Amino acid sequence: MSRILNFRAISNGALILLFLLLCHCSLVDAQALEPIGIFDHHQDVGNPKLKGSVVYDKENQTYTMAGAGKNMWATEDQFHFLWKKIKGDFIIRATIRFIGKGTADHRKIGIIARDNLNTDSRYADACVHGDILSSLQYRAKDGDSTYQVVVSSYHPTEIELERIGNTFTFSAAVFGEPYKSVSKEVALNEEVYAGLFICSHLEDVVEKAVFSNVQIIIPPPKNFVPYRDYIGSHLEIMDIETGHRKILHSAPNSLQAPNWTPDNKFLIFNSLSPKENLLYKYELATGAITKLNTGFANQNNNDHVLSYDGKMIAISNHVGEKRTSTIFMLPITGSDNPTKITSELNGHSYLHSWSPDNKKLVFTGQRNNEWNIVSVDIDTKKETILTEDATLDDGPECSPDGKYIYFNSVRTGTMQLWRMKPDGSDEEQVTFDEYNNWFPHFSPDGKWILYVAFPKDIDPTSHPFYKKIYLRLMPAAGGIPKTIGYVYGGQGTINVPSWSPDSKKIAFVSNSKLELGK
């Protein structure tokens, strides 16, 4: 009897101990996986002698990482890792900067995807060294040696790692330049640990680096149908001098084409839903979002523009069974009855600009079975066709001094920027590169032109959703454009003027499939 009691006592004690251990493990796991910014967790991999750390600056949306580790090479790795589990295709991008001169030339920072957290795991990464070396490093098998494909970008500040199936692409650039890229097939698990890393290359040294403009981008499924299926949106602002970006608002649906009000109080953007396409105001001081009343005009597209004095807004709204894009005008405070400016009987009208004197609107019009640049007198509603070209002309915008109308045209075979006098005379080409350039937008001070550059492999008559695009900046007086934005977006990113009143920042939309509630 005593033996039975002792056995039961031991069994009960063991069960209690097991229960306590399980509770402790669950508590530790819950604490360990506390998210940092957009990531799930951070930790050392490979048990480096000195421990690493991450500090997240919520206001500036930056990550300051510290880490040691012997190396990330040969058959095993030691580094500090800020990761998130990601399944399927993705893009992770970041702006990077080492802190200090460093000790070892081969200190490393970058973006990595690994099967697991073991020191010898298969992986592919976008690796930037302390010297001039930048390379896509990879380990094809657990415990195998490490190999690399070098990318010809020296001391890049802009990097991204993209996965499509088992193809990994490392793209790198110095801010202002376009990407240079290399790719490699590496068979990793469908779900990987992916994120940012730092390695000092010396076990007794801790290095530090700052990662900014960090985004995890999940593209749409391969079978998505444009203009029927949408992924999520980030409403962002950017400093044009530094390239620093900040996400102000994210939504799981399609947000498009922000305007920045001249009083510096609001961003106005359109939001798509199954029944209505409405305009909303984002208050910059508080982050509050309110609907802009457009009355019966509740099928707005992304072509809406503020008057130069900021008192009025003109919009493009789909009308009737044919959903003809038609231009209306209303006070910036909203209206139940917007004033119709163009007739749906004339064909589609997609607004892009006011004249500086606020007396005319300039738009892309479908007239006489062609798409050309058209102006309309607001008072008389009289239209003037300014270009008469059989190919597509689009995206017109008046220069602030009123001397030119800039637009984009595919008449040379690729979409390039052009300009003409306000009466349509003296057409001349402005850009001459390999990209498909859309939507020129003047800074309020008239010194700069911002536009979006689509890749060369698209249909030049289209400006599709969900592509890797550049936001480029060109002196209005002429000169070489520079790349200031490395963006996943396209349609809806900057279709309309989006400059801050002081000409120092821009607003735009980028895209990613987003998790609800995050």
Task: Describe each model-derived feature in a short phrase.
Residues 26-27, 61, 469-471:
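Short beta-strand/loop turn elements enriched in aromatics
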Residues 31-224:
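Extracellular glycan-recognition regions
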Residues 220-518:
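Sequence signature of WD/YWTD-type beta-propeller architectures
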Residues 1-32:
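Bacterial Sec-dependent N-terminal signal peptides
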Residues 23-25, 127, 199, 398:
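Generic recognition of cysteine residues
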